[in-house]
Amino acid sequence: MALTAEEKQEIIAKYATHEGDTGSPEVQVALLSKRIADLTEHLKEHKHDHHSRRGMQLMIGDRRRLLDYLKRVDINRYRSLIERLGLRR
């Protein structure tokens, strides 16, 4: 269920803005989106796992704040990211 090191490196390589980039909003949002997607699948099977549901809600809030920041700072990067990730906004 957790991200493996290989999966994490693939996501970082795909969304990095420059060499060695691991902390840009794009990378952080992409990693959170993968974790949220994995937890969503887990919760479909385990409906009463409220502890994981709470953790997922916190991750969704973190992602929302990062997206709001990116939208405020650079709207073009924001639009590009939500299109690449397939997010609704």
UniProtKB/Swiss-Prot annotation:
Name of one Pfam family that matches: Ribosomal_S15
Protein's UniProt keywords contain Ribosomal protein: yes
Cellular component GO terms, alphabetical: cytosolic small ribosomal subunit
Disulfide bond sites: none
Key words, A-Z: Ribonucleoprotein, Ribosomal protein, RNA-binding, rRNA-binding
Any one GO molecular-function label of the UniProt entry: structural constituent of ribosome
Any one GO BP annotation for this protein: translation
Its biological purpose: One of the primary rRNA binding proteins, it binds directly to 16S rRNA where it helps nucleate assembly of the platform of the 30S subunit by binding and bridging several RNA helices of the 16S rRNA.
Subunit annotation: Part of the 30S ribosomal subunit. Forms a bridge to the 50S subunit in the 70S ribosome, contacting the 23S rRNA.
Family that this chain belongs to: Belongs to the universal ribosomal protein uS15 family.
Protein name (database record): Small ribosomal subunit protein uS15
Organism: Bifidobacterium longum (strain NCC 2705)
Originating gene: rpsO
